Amino acid sequence: MSDCVIHTHWAGPMGNMQYVIQSGSEALIVDPAWDIPELQAIVTQHGLTVVGILLTHEHYDHVSGVPECLALNKVPVYISEYAHYDPPVPMVLNRLAVGATIPFAGHTIAVLHTPGHSPGGVCYQLGKQLITGDTVFVDGCGRADFPHSDVAQLYTALFETLWPLPDDTVIYPGHDYGPTPTDTWGNQKKTNRFLQSETREVFLRKRKG
């Protein structure tokens, strides 16, 4: 998917990074929670048609703007089938099973099941581009002390699901918490202290600490 352009919009009190993924004249919006008019302005500026909304997980700071987005764009909303809501969200969702794919502008987006920070955590792989949500940040990873978090699942997500990805894959996290907004996966293996855990037990201690 080398022809995909990822536009970033920084918003909210927690350094959220929301994305508009462009391929040709089509667009996907990722994790709309803040400043929906500004996200829509990116769409309009580039003459795009929104064809879907991708949610990396179910936390409020990643989904709260979906109803406003849907008022502007009547499109499918994609999220993991394992996402947990309390209370339930008032919208129709396309639940993604493990191994699911999403067609986009003649391409295929791979949905990588990465729970741990939340039950519904997923990453979206677009060739050498990876939308990671709160699974992994630049030089960090998602917290695992929320209700329904599971630090052991987070270890599996990082070291079994994501670890084999090509080193030149560029990660696009859900928050701007690092020295740079994005980075290559290979560089993160060298600089991210959570990814430098020698064993599962070491990682669990680091993330719980």
Summary of predicted features, one role per range:
Residues 53-63, 112-121, 172-178:
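Histidine-centered catalytic micro-motifs
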Residues 9-10, 93-94, 113-115:
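Short Gly/Pro-enriched turn/cap motifs at secondary-structure boundaries
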Residues 119-208:
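Metallo-beta-lactamase
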Residues 19-22, 99-126:
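Core dinuclear metal-dependent hydrolase active-site scaffold
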